[in-house]
Regions:
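Active-site-adjacent alpha-helix immediately C-terminal to a catalytic or transition-state-stabilizing loop
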Residues: 2-8, 20, 24, 132-185
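Active-site-proximal alpha-helix that buttresses catalytic centers in soluble enzyme cores
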Residues: 2-84, 101-132, 176-179, 184
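A generic "cationic amphipathic patch" detector
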Residues: 26-29, 71, 83, 92, ...
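Signature for phosphate-centric chemistry
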Residues: 84-99
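Proteins with a high burden of low-complexity, intrinsically disordered sequence enriched in S/T/G/P/A and R
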Residues: 63, 85-87, 161-166
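Residues in and immediately flanking transmembrane alpha helices
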Residues: 28, 96-100, 163
Length: 185
């Protein structure tokens, strides 16, 4: 069901802040373990002022932090779960027993993602492909909706939405936890 002004409105929301504390430096094995633990961690119960959003369809990823955030915003409703809006997975850039800083592991892993390194579980091409697939689905369904997704993935999703003709309320280099971006077509 579309809103009253006949424009398709999609609210892209970054999940709430995760209740997890990363080590400042770690070995490759420790980093990989922390990435797994982060993906299983709940969101913090903070007083985040989420925007008031009314829509029929709410998409969440398969990661619990997405669903928990959706419950905080929309209450107990039926959510449409999709792997297409899952965060871009991350792992260590190489194996080492030497402890390296967290910023190094994050940067090196995302650089490998960018060049489609087989070391990373998913490369940039794969991420763009699933974002494009999800945007195509949104355009076919043509219903106002909310998407509770993840920070790194949001950049790719919003880029694909622009390519599909959506107008983006505001772009950012970094999307804050709980931030909603309004996309309309």
């Amino acid at each position: 069901m579309k809103n009253g002004d006949d424009n398709l409105k999609v609210f892209v929301i970054r999940h709430g802040k995760v209740d997890f504390f990363w080590s400042r430096s770690c070995t490759s094995e420790q980093f990989d373990k922390e990435c797994e633990e982060y993906d299983k961690s709940p969101i913090r119960k903070e007083n985040i002022r989420f925007p008031e959003i009314k829509c029929q369809k709410i998409y969440v990823s398969t990661l619990s932090r997405s669903r928990e955030t959706a419950k905080e915003i929309f209450g107990e409703k039926e959510f449409m779960e999709s792997k297409l809006i899952h965060e871009v997975p991350l792992r260590s850039a190489f194996d080492t027993t030497k402890k390296l800083p967290l910023w190094f592991w994050n940067t090196a892993g995302r650089l490998q993602w960018f060049v489609n390194s087989k070391r990373q579980p998913e490369g940039r091409y794969q991420t763009h492909k699933r974002a494009k697939q999800f945007v195509k689905r949104l355009c076919i369904e043509n219903e106002d909706c909310a998407i509770v997704t993840h920070g790194f993935y949001m950049h790719t999703l919003i880029k694909e939405m622009k390519r599909a003709g959506f107008t983006i309320e505001k772009n950012a280099l970094h999307y804050k936890n709980g931030q909603a971006i309004v996309c309309s077509k």
